[in-house]
């Protein structure tokens, strides 16, 4: 009987401690607390003898744990020992700070001390045969207090008891802590001062069998939760919640010692069926004190129970914990999906034995799986109409169309919504292509999801296969799975072919002669995104094609950067922003020598657009042109136009220039150059009459005066030239013209 009562008291104490820790949002298991206190009893055998748990006694327990840690090492102490010790110390410290709790605890402590007794080591006193016959077997009713218990000792002379008769009890002297350490350990805690109960030889304490039966029934009803309140309970001042208590405090029950129950003479004594396995020993104290003790303890329990408030179920989105509440079913516009099967569930430890039955019941009532909330809206026909118009005008893979689809996918579209959108907006061929791509990507996502345990029906949920083809079931998917569905739908949409463009390979995309380099790179990257995915537009293969498939002008401009490791293609676009700029840069780099590139330019220069205006006043000797090397991309027309004649001028024989452009007046020998032809010749005139009527005189053909000839040495001339010198012609007689 005693072991069953002790077991129930331990369970009640552990449950109260769990409730106290739950107020501070700390959840512990019952078996962990049991193992913790088992280790405490092993380390501190004096701890059960104290009879109560307060900050002073708990501090001594901490000192013992520290000594045990220093002597035996950390491997002999469980990991969670000091954690539980600190939590219980905080509970005791915070409760001692509240004046109301202190007042209530002081009143209850006075009641318990006044009706308790100190431990005794004296031998039990023998009793007479009549007393033995009238007594019942010793037993203890189950108590709700794990720290204080009073049991009536056995009257059997042949058997020793831990609790001797009250007649032999005396007040033990107060022992010091040093002397207490050498005393043998006691098994159950007891309280001091038993003078009020010490009445060994009085016959007034003996009860008749009828009163004893009523007393047993009343004491057995103490632990009954249906026991009504007593009418003569003393009133206590109202209790104010302490400052450290949160907004919701769970019910806290206070344990009381098992003492003597009232007799049948007490008015208002309740009657209830006896509990199994519970019996009371023969009372040895006054009836009035027993009744008053029970009234005071019941009042204390009632006052503390009235302070209990059930905590509201708080709902937290992230992080997901075991204490998260369920979402209310009356929430409108919300979907409460099933837990994500792609996440690793929490492994629950199996509890075995009677000590874990209560813990399993409490954990079964709490949600062990996280609850997700997300907003789901059905597709709007106006939005589908916009996407259909964009697909018809620009194509399914146009930037504007893809932007509309991406904005629509933020509404957590289900697989049924994606299939409906593809069937309504795309053409027949594009719809089939999208479905095949979506199923392929869904299988890839299901294979990449490597979790333990494997996801339940993961390959069936993403494509919306049976039994998840219903849209209502798909709306209950967790956000993680809906995100994978969104990614698969967008990726399959971007792989559709462009509008009006034949499907070609990536290597056949080349830059046109008049196409800008940026447009060529844009076409190349769009095709790479459609074929390989969004992450392959900046790959090394695409960069290689951007150089090899460019036109010759852009290749010459970006050739110095070919061997460099470029993270992006921005430097290539800077040097080839347009085809004309790239051609000019390539031509300039080919025609200029390295020495000319490094030659410093003058600070001031005169730019002459027409150098022919200076040739009359300052003729310049023109050197024959040198043979220039032919370049493949050099402008040959401009070079041929600037080249002069390869022979000297036939008119002046001084330089290499054309005769039509010669401006010299003297030839190489110093002789004046006579202009040939009638460039400056005027109209012919008629003859004039003079004194000689038979002669006609005509005006000379040249209006300009004949220049004075220099004096020439005819002898020298004749020697050098065998030709005879011509004389100056005078007037000439000619016949008159036939007509005027």
Curated annotation (Swiss-Prot):
Region: Disordered, residue numbers: 115-208, 323-376, 446-469, 673-740
GO biological process: viral budding via host ESCRT complex; viral translational frameshifting
GO cellular component annotations of the record: viral nucleocapsid
Biased composition (Acidic residues): 346-366
Protein name: Gag polyprotein
Record's keyword annotation contains Translocase: no
Keyword Phosphoprotein attributed: yes
Function comment: Matrix protein p10: Matrix protein. Nucleocapsid protein p14: Nucleocapsid protein.
Site (Cleavage): residue numbering on this chain: 163-164, 318-319, 648-649
Gene from which this protein is expressed: gag
Compositional bias of kind Polar residues: 117-132, 193-206, 323-334, 677-704, 715-732
Chain intervals with Basic and acidic residues compositional bias: 446-459
Residue window of motif PTAP/PSAP motif: 396-399
GO molecular function, one term: structural constituent of virion
Lipidation (N-myristoyl glycine): 2
UniProt entry keywords in alphabetical sequence: Capsid protein, Host-virus interaction, Lipoprotein, Myristate, Phosphoprotein, Repeat, Viral budding, Viral budding via the host ESCRT complexes, Viral matrix protein, Viral nucleoprotein, Viral release from host cell, Virion
């Amino acid at each position: 009987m005693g072991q069953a009562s002790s077991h129930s008291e331990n369970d009640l104490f552990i449950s109260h401690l769990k409730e106290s820790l739950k107020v501070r949002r700390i959840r512990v298991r019952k078996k962990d607390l049991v193992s913790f206190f088992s280790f405490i009893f092993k380390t501190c055998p004096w701890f059960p003898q104290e009879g109560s748990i307060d900050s002073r006694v708990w501090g001594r327990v901490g000192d013992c744990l520290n000594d045990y840690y220093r002597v035996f090492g950390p491997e002999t102490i469980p990991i969670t020992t000091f954690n539980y010790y600190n939590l219980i110390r905080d509970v005791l410290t915070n409760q001692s700070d509240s004046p109301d709790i202190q007042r209530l605890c002081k009143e209850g402590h006075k009641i318990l001390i006044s009706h308790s007794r100190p431990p005794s080591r004296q031998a039990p006193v023998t009793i007479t045969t009549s007393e033995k016959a009238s007594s019942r077997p010793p037993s203890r009713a189950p108590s709700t207090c794990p720290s204080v218990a009073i049991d009536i000792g056995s009257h059997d002379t042949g058997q020793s008891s831990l609790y001797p008769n009250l007649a032999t009890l005396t007040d033990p002297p107060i022992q010091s802590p040093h002397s207490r350490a050498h005393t043998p350990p006691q098994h159950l805690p007891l309280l001091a001062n038993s003078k009020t109960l010490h009445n060994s030889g009085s016959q007034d304490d003996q009860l008749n069998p009828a009163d004893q039966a009523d007393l047993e029934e009343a004491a057995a009803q103490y632990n009954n939760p249906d026991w009504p309140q007593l009418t003569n309970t003393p009133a206590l001042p109202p209790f104010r919640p302490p400052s450290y208590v949160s907004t919701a405090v769970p019910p806290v029950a206070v344990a009381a010692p098992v003492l003597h129950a009232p007799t049948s003479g007490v008015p208002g004594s309740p009657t209830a069926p006896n509990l199994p396995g519970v019996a009371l020993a023969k009372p040895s104290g006054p009836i009035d004190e027993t009744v008053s003790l029970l009234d005071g303890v019941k009042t204390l329990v009632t006052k503390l129970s009235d302070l209990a408030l059930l905590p509201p179920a708080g709902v937290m989105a992230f992080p997901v914990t075991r204490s998260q509440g369920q979402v209310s079913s009356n929430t409108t516009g919300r979907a409460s999906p099933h837990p994500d099967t792609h996440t690793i569930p929490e492994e629950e430890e199996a509890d075995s034995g009677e000590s874990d039955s209560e813990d399993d019941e409490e954990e079964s009532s709490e949600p062990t799986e996280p609850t997700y909330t997300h907003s789901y809206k059905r597709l709007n026909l106006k939005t589908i109409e916009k996407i259909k118009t964009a697909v018809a005008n620009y194509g399914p893979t146009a930037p504007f169309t893809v932007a509309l689809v991406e904005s629509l996918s933020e509404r957590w579209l289900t697989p049924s919504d994606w299939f409906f959108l593809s069937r309504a907006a795309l053409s027949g061929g594009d719809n089939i292509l999208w479905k095949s791509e979506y199923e392929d990507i869904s299988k890839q996502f299901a294979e990449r999801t490597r979790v333990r345990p494997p996801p339940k029906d993961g390959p069936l949920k993403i494509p919306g296969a049976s039994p998840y083809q219903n849209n209502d079931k798909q709306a209950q998917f967790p956000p993680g799975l809906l995100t994978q569905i969104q990614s698969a739908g967008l990726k399959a949409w971007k792989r559709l072919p462009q509008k009006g463009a034949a499907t070609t390979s990536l290597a056949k995309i080349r830059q046109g002669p008049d196409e800008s380099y940026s447009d060529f790179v844009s076409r190349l990257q769009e095709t790479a995104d459609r074929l390989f995915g969004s992450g392959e537009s900046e790959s090394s293969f695409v960069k290689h094609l951007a150089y090899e498939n460019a036109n010759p002008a852009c290749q010459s401009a970006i050739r110095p950067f070919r061997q460099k490791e470029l993270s992006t293609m921005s430097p290539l676009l800077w040097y080839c922003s347009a085809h004309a700029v790239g051609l000019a840069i390539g031509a300039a780099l080919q025609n200029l020598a390295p020495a000319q590139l490094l030659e410093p330019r003058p600070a001031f220069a005169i730019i002459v657009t027409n150098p022919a205006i200076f040739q009359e006043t300052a003729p310049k000797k023109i050197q024959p042109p040198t043979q220039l090397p032919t370049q493949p991309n050099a402008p040959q027309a401009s070079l041929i136009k600037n080249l002069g004649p390869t022979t000297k001028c036939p008119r002046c024989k001084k330089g290499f220039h054309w005769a039509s452009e010669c401006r010299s007046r003297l030839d190489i020998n110093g002789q004046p150059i006579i202009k040939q032809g009638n460039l400056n010749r005027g109209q012919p005139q008629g003859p004039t009459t003079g004194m000689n009527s038979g002669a006609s005189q005509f005006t000379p053909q040249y209006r300009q005066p004949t220049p004075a000839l220099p004096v020439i040495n005819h002898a020298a001339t004749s020697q050098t030239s065998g030709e005879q010198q011509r004389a100056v012609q005078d007037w000439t007689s000619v016949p008159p013209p036939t007509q005027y």
